[in-house]
């Protein structure tokens, strides 16, 4: 049989088939089946901070503002704990790299989520930056700079490879990709 071994983002893969973040990768059981079917690596379904915030917002009680803060913290911790457990369980049942994927809205969450995912055993991190800008005052080029800033902050706190996932709303993707690699990205994906 042909040897399909390759390297991606510094990770050794038995083949170049990487299962992307989706509903197919949201449980350790599914991930085990994907690994057994021959996947070279798995990107877990993304954890979206925005979804956590929306869920907390939907449960707000306007008559008890203090309780809303506790509720938001509880939901955040619960969702993050579930995701960290997904990493740990997937690592137990898979013999291939497990890549955590995060999409955060606030700068502090990127760093906190990244550290905890590395500690949970993720082999690499995919940073999914997707934000639709509707503010007319938003400075041209700020979105691209945000990618570089987030990467730089995360690289300071984790040792595992950081993969940057780009959306389709960039003014100059080639220049941004060059800057991401120059600032330590292990890989860039679309």
Residue map of PLM features:
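Short linear motifs at secondary-structure transitions and domain/linker junctions
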Residues: 1, 16-19, 74-76, 139-140, ...
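N-terminal amphipathic alpha-helix/helix-capping segment at the start of soluble metabolic enzymes
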Residues: 1-18, 83-91
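Flexible, active-site-adjacent loop/turn segments at secondary-structure boundaries
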Residues: 2-11, 22, 45, 57, ...
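N-terminal binding-site loop/beta-alpha segment at the start of enzyme catalytic domains
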Residues: 15-31
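Alpha/beta enzyme core
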Residues: 27-65, 78-99, 103-190
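Short glycine/proline- and acidic residue-enriched helix-loop micro-motifs
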Residues: 67-74
């Amino acid at each position: 049989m042909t040897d399909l071994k390759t390297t991606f983002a510094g990770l050794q893969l038995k083949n170049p088939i990487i299962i992307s973040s989706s509903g197919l990768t949201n449980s350790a059981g599914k991930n085990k089946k994907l690994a057994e079917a021959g996947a070279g690596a798995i990107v877990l379904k993304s954890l979206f901070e925005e979804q956590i915030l929306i869920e907390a917002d939907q449960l707000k009680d306007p008559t008890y503002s203090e309780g809303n803060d506790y509720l938001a913290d509880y939901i955040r911790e619960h969702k993050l704990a579930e995701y960290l457990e997904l990493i740990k369980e997937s690592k137990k049942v898979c013999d291939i790299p497990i890549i955590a994927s995060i999409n955060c809205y606030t700068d502090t969450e990127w760093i906190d989520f990244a550290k905890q995912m590395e500690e949970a055993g993720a082999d690499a991190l995919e940073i999914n930056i997707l934000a639709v800008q509707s503010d007319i005052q938003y400075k041209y080029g700020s979105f691209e700079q945000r990618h570089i800033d987030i990467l730089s902050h995360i690289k300071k706190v984790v040792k595992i490879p950081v993969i940057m996932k780009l959306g389709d709303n960039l003014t100059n993707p080639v220049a941004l990709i060059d800057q991401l690699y120059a600032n330590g990205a292990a890989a860039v994906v679309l």
